[in-house]
């Protein structure tokens, strides 16, 4: 007999996930469920699945599964929505929510409009720039001169791209170029995602600098394909802008689904991401 599973669909600038309250619902095969519900024709339709669970180290724990069923370390847009979900559903009714992820505990400061949660600023932690910890395969010299992977030429299917590699808890390859709207991402995105340089695969951001305070990007997400937005990707692009001398530490990142404000704090080395969080609808899914 089919069992009704209660869910809420939420989105952060178009990056949409199905959220399930793990305090109340039991999910035995989350990867398989993610594949089914993410299908935009035969399921609910989403970029993946997020489980909100009890935590021993934070207010809640989130597990995030991509549309292909693979589990990811975290998602910046999703963690904002987790903060809103936790507040709206009375799991924790306070302005600052701590969320345990596979990339560490994230601090989510909720933003309110007319008494309702409309978004959040998230402390995304410090960017990881050491190639081995991103991870990206490269030779590291003894004098430390190869401790960052910045604007390095990489052959991808016979074409050279300058890649800057950053981890925001998950791996990112950032490429700066003109004409990002003309890119055939479904064709070239998988070539980066599965490139042997990245042993855990990678998210790939194609970024176009508009000014010292604004940059546009498109993203090919590991396990999900092209999405309207990627929070950790926007953070990686902002960090890469600074590393390449293209922008300052406060930058607006414009994605297909909307814009995020990213601040890379020089004193703490932490990256802060600010953006919206929206509930789309709730319902029951039968399994």
Swiss-Prot record:
Gene Ontology MF, one: diaminopimelate epimerase activity
Keywords carried by this UniProt record: Amino-acid biosynthesis, Cytoplasm, Isomerase, Lysine biosynthesis
Entry GO CC: cytosol
Active site: 75 (proton donor), 230 (proton acceptor)
Marked site: Could be important to modulate the pK values of the two catalytic cysteine residues: 172, 221
E.C. numbers: 5.1.1.7
Gene3D superfamilies: Diaminopimelate Epimerase, Chain A, domain 1 (3.10.310.10)
Matching InterPro entries: DAP_epimerase_AS, DAP_epimerase_DapF
Pathway: Amino-acid biosynthesis; L-lysine biosynthesis via DAP pathway; DL-2,6-diaminopimelate from LL-2,6-diaminopimelate: step 1/1
Chief site of localization: cytoplasm
Any Gene Ontology biological process: lysine biosynthetic process via diaminopimelate
Localization per record: Cytoplasm
Binding site for substrate: 15, 66, 76-77, 170, 203, 221-222, 231-232
Catalytic reaction list: (2S,6S)-2,6-diaminopimelate = meso-2,6-diaminopimelate
Cited NCBIfam families: DapF
Role: Catalyzes the stereoinversion of LL-2,6-diaminopimelate (L,L-DAP) to meso-diaminopimelate (meso-DAP), a precursor of L-lysine and an essential component of the bacterial peptidoglycan.
UniProt family annotation: Belongs to the diaminopimelate epimerase family.
HAMAP family assigned to the protein according to its UniProt record, in alphabetical order: DAP_epimerase (MF_00197)
Subunit-level organization: Homodimer.
Name of the protein in its database record: Diaminopimelate epimerase
Organism: Desulfovibrio desulfuricans (strain ATCC 27774 / DSM 6949 / MB)
């Amino acid at each position: 007999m089919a069992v009704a599973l209660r869910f809420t669909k939420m989105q952060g600038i178009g990056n949409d996930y199905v959220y399930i309250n793990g305090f109340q619902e039991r999910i035995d095969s989350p990867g398989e469920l993610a594949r089914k519900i993410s299908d935009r024709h035969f399921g609910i339709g989403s970029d993946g699945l997020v489980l909100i669970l009890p935590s021993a180290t934070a207010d809640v724990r989130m597990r995030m599964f991509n549309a292909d069923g693979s589990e990811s370390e975290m998602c910046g847009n999703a963690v904002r929505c987790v903060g809103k979900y936790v507040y709206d559903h009375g799991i924790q009714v306070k302005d600052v929510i701590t969320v345990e992820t596979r990339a560490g505990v994230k601090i989510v400061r909720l933003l309110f409009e007319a008494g309702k949660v409309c978004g959040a600023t998230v402390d995304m932690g410090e960017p990881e720039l050491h190639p081995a910890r991103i991870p990206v395969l490269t030779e590291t010299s003894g004098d430390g001169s190869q401790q960052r992977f910045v604007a390095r030429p990489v052959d991808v299917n016979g074409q050279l791209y300058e890649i800057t590699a950053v981890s925001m808890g998950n791996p990112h390859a950032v490429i700066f170029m003109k004409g990002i709207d003309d890119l055939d991402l479904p064709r070239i995105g998988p070539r980066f995602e599965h490139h042997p340089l990245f042993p855990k695969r990678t998210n790939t951001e194609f970024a176009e600098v508009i000014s010292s305070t604004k940059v546009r990007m498109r993203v090919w997400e590991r396990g999900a394909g092209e999405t309207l937005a990627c929070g950790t990707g926007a953070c990686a692009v902002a960090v890469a802008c600074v590393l390449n001398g293209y922008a300052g530490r406060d930058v607006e990142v414009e994605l297909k689904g909307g814009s995020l404000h990213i601040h890379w704090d020089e004193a703490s080395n932490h990256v802060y991401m600010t953006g919206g969080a929206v509930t789309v609808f709730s319902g029951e899914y039968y399994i």
